[in-house]
Amino acid sequence: ASQRTLKKEIIAEVMRLFDEALIIRAVSGSEAMQAKIEDLMDDIMVFTDDSLRRVTHPSGKHNPQLVKAYYRDLRHYIITNLTSFSERLDDFVEGL
C-alpha cells in the first residue's frame, strides 16, 4: 500500500470516530461528560497528527526489510489506538 492510501485510511477512520464523538457530546447532558469527550477528541487529533507524520518518515529508508517492519509496526500502532478510542467512545455511550 502506498503512503497516500494509508493516510486516507487513517483520516477516514479518525473522521468516523470524531463524528461519533461529536454526536455523543451533543446528546450528553452533563458538562463533566462533555469535558471528558473533548479530552478524547483532543487525544484523537494528537494521534492523527502523529500517525500522519510517521507515515511519511519511515526509518531505514534505504533498507526494504526495515521499511516493511516499520510499516507493520505502524499499522499495529494505528489499529491498537483506533480500537482504544472506539472502546472509550462505547463507554460514553453506555454512560448515557
Predicted regions and their residues:
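Conserved acidic
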Residues: S2, K36, Y70
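Inter-helical turn/loop segments and adjacent helix faces that build the functional surface
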Residues: I24-Q34, L96
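Amphipathic, heptad-repeat alpha-helices with coiled-coil/zipper character that mediate oligomerization
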Residues: K8-R16, A35-R54
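Short terminal alpha-helical segments
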Residues: S2-S28
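Low-complexity intrinsically disordered segments
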Residues: D39-D42, D50-L96
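N-terminal leader/targeting helix
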Residues: A1-S2, Q65
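Serine/threonine-rich low-complexity intrinsically disordered regions
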Residues: T5-K7, G29-S30, K36, D49, ...
